[in-house]
Amino acid sequence: MAQGLTLAGVPLEFLFFALVLGTIAAKPALAGRAAAAGALGISLYKLACSPFDEGAGWHGLLAHAGHEWVGLVNLLALLLGFALLARHFENSRASHALRHALGEGPATGFILLLGVFVLASFLDNIAAAMIGGAIARSVFRGRVHVGYLAAIVAASNAGGSGSVIGDTTTTMMWLAGVPPAAVFTAYVAAASALLVVALPASLQQHRYSPAVRGPVEHHPVDWGSVAVVGFVLCLAIAANLLVNLEFAGWAGVFPFLGLSVWLALLLATPLRRPEWLALPGALRSAAFLLSLVWCASLMPVQALPPASWPVTLAAGFVSAVFDNIPLTALALKQGGYDWGYLAYAVGFGGSLLWFGSSAGVALADMFPEARSARAWLTQGWHVGVAYVAGFFVMLAVLGWSA
């Protein structure tokens, strides 16, 4: 099959994608338009000058879309559904009750991050991050430090990295025959990284806007909204387990997880009506992330370097700007990896930038001040340190076992 154009040996697709990412990092206000323009521009370029993995021209484009649609629709449904779920949680006033339970001082921020980590181990990391963000908004009186927002995303991605139901990439490994125990070892790195992130982030947040119990709320918890949140989460977990345990062959055929979230929201409407006004903002964020995922899927990556721990470490940094699903698919096809390391790298690595993971994009929709690559990198400096530290702790404790 003919190859596309190159510049100094680099396929033009990569240069176009780098231009998109550079624009997003430099001009956050243009992020949505830059991502959409990149998705359209790279698609047109591949139609005219460079074949898709599935073939050239319109046939290749349609075949590629057929290959990607389940993941894209699932992601869209989850981002929109969990945006409505987060509003249910905020409207329940449960976060106000938690504000009194969590207490005061720097330990409050640490405990909340630990809770997000645990929640993400059995729940989608998007939901874990958004629930964590909703609690943080209440506990810290609406003033949440960007460094702490980065820590919430890191905690959610770390929590899902060692669980075969906690992240799409780990589920992919499970479906490909990787034993859950091999993925579970990622928690050695993830737990270490959580400690490195949580300590400075909690102190950052305490200096910026400390947690206070405040006056006793006169409005009781809306248990109807709490019931809706619990129902949606339980149905999502049940659907995820059922599909992957009993109908694994269908997991890549239809967006069952996203559908289950929306089915639960609609079934619960008689009890509590969703706050539909939250959808336009969530849709803009979803369109941004879907455009980036589509761009990443168009990159002509046919193979990864031979598996080793330095390559796996580098994959984590790459996953901050490149969709981790095709990275994981390539690694599974190639083989030779220690899967615990890969699960940690492609999971936690997405926390390095606000647009590096779906959890980050979802949280940035709740807190627009997070949409700054400079602020994320400078104020969330501990995320990068934690990623490297966690990786080398795991290497020292377990060694590399391919």
Where are these regions (language model features)?
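Hydrophobic mid-bilayer segments of alpha-helices in multi-pass membrane transport proteins
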Residues: V10-L21, P28-A56, L72-L84, S225-L235, ...
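Hydrophobic transmembrane alpha-helices that form the pore/transport pathway of multi-pass ion
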Residues: A107-S161, M172-A176, A329-Y344, G399-W400
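Transmembrane helical segments that form the transport core of multi-pass membrane transport proteins
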Residues: F231-Y337
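Short helix-coil transition sites and intra-membrane helix breaks within transmembrane domains
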Residues: P28-A31, L85-R93, L119-I131, G159-D167, ...
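Long, contiguous bundles of hydrophobic transmembrane helices that form the permeation core
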Residues: L194-W262
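Juxtamembrane and boundary regions of transmembrane helices in multi-pass small-molecule transporters
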Residues: A26, G32, L85, N91, ...
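Membrane-interfacial loop-to-helix junctions in multi-pass transporters
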Residues: A8-E13, G71-L75, A101-L114, F140-A150, ...
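Interfacial loop-to-helix junctions that mark the boundaries of transmembrane helices
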Residues: Q3-G9, P28, G57-L75, P179-A189, ...
